[in-house]
Amino acid sequence: ELYPVDAHAAPMAASSHVAAVPESGEELATQCQTLMENLLALSGFDRVLYYRFMPEGDGEVLAEARREGVTGSYQGLRFPASDIPYIARQLYLKNPWRTIPDATAAPVPIYAAQAGATPDLSFVDLRSASPVHLEYMANMGVGGAISLPIIQGGELDALISCHVAAPKQLTVSQLDSMRALSEGFNLRLRDFKARRRQQVIDGLQRHFDHAKTVLMRHGELESAWEELSDWLMETFAADGVMLQMGEEYYQHGVGLTPHVMSMVAQQAAAEATHVWLSDSLQRDCPGMPLSEVAGVALISDLPLDQHHTVNLYLCRVEHIYDVTWGGN
């Protein structure tokens, strides 16, 4: 590609600050906001957004930085999955950025050397955008844009989207500096998630050490269940708890039928995990019948009994919340 170069591009100061892996969700949010502000300064754009994808594919703006004088905020708004089609999301997994320096530029056709062949533009940085996306940008008052992917576990976790009202071309070195900042945050986010998961596992171990103590005090599960189930409900803020020990089932509060418990266990086994979480059983467990239980946490193979397989199901009912959608 013959990339446009501005011989007099403004110098960019490289950040010498190396942030530590955040210790809390609040610190992670602060680092995300700082990233938005740094990218805004580096790019000279009008607005930078952190757009995280939800499990259903919709996206929500979690952080935003705006140039002084730019009005209107997208923070907290949610946008439908169709705004960023599947094929576009796959391209973000292959490329360090996507840039549209001028949304009003007339596209120039590219022809393959071999007659009748279609050139693969997957890694072409200067390819044009689809007419639908260009109309989308025009409706937002955006003349130029840059997007940087946040990839976690091989999946597109979020997009950093930079907008400017008038067409604006950045140099490759400028884009690479922005990429380095976003990748640094990406690595810290990965380590933060890994640390949080380990903390959850360690916390579960401490909790079930307490459960063992309760069982030992009562001598058998049947007599310990009332105290144990109350403690589990309070500790995990659950609406119901079920314990499966071999062929026996114990329940307190809302619960699942043995058939549904088996379906959940099979889904967890298919994903090869001992801690399986879902905030929507209808979405995450195919063929799930309707019930008052909307979400469940399954902790399988608990070390509570050396003679039986022990699985714990923590259930929650439906939680209603408001979603603010962007657009009309």
Predicted feature descriptions by range:
Residues A105-V142, S280-L298, E318-N328:
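Signal-transducing coupling segments at domain and membrane junctions
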Residues A13, T34, S161, L170-R190, ...:
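Amphipathic alpha-helical "output/dimerization" segments
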Residues E1-A14, L40-L62:
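Hydrophobic or amphipathic alpha-helical targeting/insertion segments
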